[in-house]
From Swiss-Prot:
Known partners and oligomeric status: Homodimer. Interacts with the C-terminal 54 residues of sigma factor SigA (RpoV).
Cellular compartment(s): Cytoplasm
Organism listed in the record: Mycobacterium tuberculosis (strain ATCC 25618 / H37Rv)
Cofactor binding summary note: Binds 1 [4Fe-4S] cluster per subunit. Following nitrosylation of the [4Fe-4S] cluster binds 1 [4Fe-8(NO)] cluster per subunit.
Binding site for [4Fe-4S] cluster: C23, C53, C56, C62
Gene deletion effect: Not essential for growth in culture, or growth in vivo in mouse and guinea pig infections. Disruption significantly enhances survival of immunocompetent mice. Decreased bacterial growth in guinea pig lungs, but not spleen. Growth on minimal media, glucose or succinate is poor, suggesting WhiB3 is involved in starvation response. Growth on acetate is better than wild-type. 55-fold decreased survival at pH 4.5, no difference at pH 5.5 or 6.6.
Protein name, as recorded: Redox- and pH-responsive transcriptional regulator WhiB3
Keyword tags: 4Fe-4S, Cytoplasm, Disulfide bond, DNA-binding, Iron, Iron-sulfur, Metal-binding, Stress response, Transcription, Transcription regulation, Virulence
Modification note: The 4Fe-4S cluster interacts with NO, forming a protein-bound dinitrosyliron dithiol complex.
Residue ranges occupied by any 4Fe-4S Wbl-type domain in the UniProt entry: 22-86
Length: 102
């Protein structure tokens, strides 16, 4: 099935950045953990996802989206679930100098 080049209607402003994501069309299992995944396997999968995010032209838009909507699962904008949770609670931003973009 062909991928759309632009999203329709009011969603375009919110979601169009996803069309430029390096992850577009990739297997989502790289970014979202299977049930029960823990430890080394989870860490390694997250690191592979974050490597892709670091090269992505829309990393900032992706990260902002995930923080704004409180995305509960997966690696978004180079941040894992737990990293986003810490950022949203203010802990990580203060201790590591990471700022939240809006």
């Amino acid at each position: 099935m062909p991928q759309p080049e632009q999203l329709p209607g009011p969603n375009a402003d919110i979601w169009n950045w996803q069309l430029q994501g390096l992850c577009r069309g990739m297997d989502s299992s790289m970014f979202f953990h299977p049930d029960g995944e823990r430890g080394r396997a989870r860490t390694q999968r997250e690191q592979r996802a974050k490597e892709m995010c670091r090269r992505c032209p829309v990393i900032e838009a992706c990260r902002s989206h995930a923080l704004e909507v409180g995305e509960p699962y997966g690696v978004w904008g180079g941040l894992s679930e737990s990293e986003r949770d810490l950022l949203l609670k203010g802990t990580m931003g203060r201790t590591r100098g990471i700022r939240r973009t809006a």
